[in-house]
Amino acid sequence: QSFQTFSVTYMHSAKVQFLLNDLQGVHRLSSREENLARLRSSVREIQPGQKFEVKDFDPQDAEGIAALFYAVYGETIPVDSVYDPEHYIQANADRQMHHIVGRTASGDVVGLHAYFRNPPGKHIMELGSWIVLPSYRNTSLALRLVQHSLGNVPDYLGLHVVYTQNVCDHLISQKVTDRFKARSCAIELEAMPSRPDDAPDGAGGRISMIDAFLVRQDIPHAVRLPSVYAAVLEGMYASRGLQREFVEDDRPQGMSRSSVESMDAASLARMTVQAVGTDIAEHIGRFVLESPDRHIHQVVLPLWQPGVSVAVRAARSVGFFLGGLLPLWDDRDMLLMQKLRTEPDYSKVQL
């Protein structure tokens, strides 16, 4: 079947837009208009049926990666940096990203998989941007990209965990992830809009995502389990082979600290709590009130911090419910909670 069911679009790539901002101070990146003009003028057909190899990124691949995004998605991606070759060169050099490419003997880039720093921890990266040129989707390239990505994780990245998201409007990516021993730990209901090629009225429906984790090196530590979810979380830890010390929760102290990430294209807002304070209920309530138009709100809570039970009660009181466990998300475990504007369409979720 079409590789379109495999590919993860850059819908969530607003999460890595910070790279563009950081790198502009290092090297003058071209504007979106400059890059698109260059790509328009250099469009050509890549000969199908060429032999290819799967390799780690080389600076000579940068232009080909930008061209691949353009060939597959045109000018629809809202993240400017995906069209800029210099972005890939600098981000790989700075170890903020790590690309794996499918490269033909003539040097054309016909496939891509990439690590990028989305989770807050130092020892975890997200694996995504799984893309293959349409004329190469009937080959082994898609699977070979995954095999290389998960079987040859560079030591210099220092990763304890590889995190990936699998769509729930089909089972293919979930099965591939399971084959490589990544474990599903959370579900983000309706976290993405319907696919661009769905009916104009969005009849395909919003897409839920499974958060899966390949734990390469577990880091045992103490966690506080909110009583309402304790049985579920204890079962998840046991079934996924994660060693934790369960300690009694305590009252929160001080003031709450958090950061908010907003993804307009997905109508999603996420608050990650760095410190659970005595004002956590007001903190969560304000977060919801300040983005009332979002289809989905998410709150990510630190399971190692005193007061997480208070935070869970506060979130539940305004409509949040369990999304799941995020192992070593900030180099320690965090809890995902979510709130949807409307009742989810569970008939669209394939597991």
Question: Which ranges hold each PLM region?
Answer:
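Conserved acetyl-CoA-binding loop-helix of GNAT-fold acetyltransferases
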Residues: 1, 132, 138-153, 162-164, ...
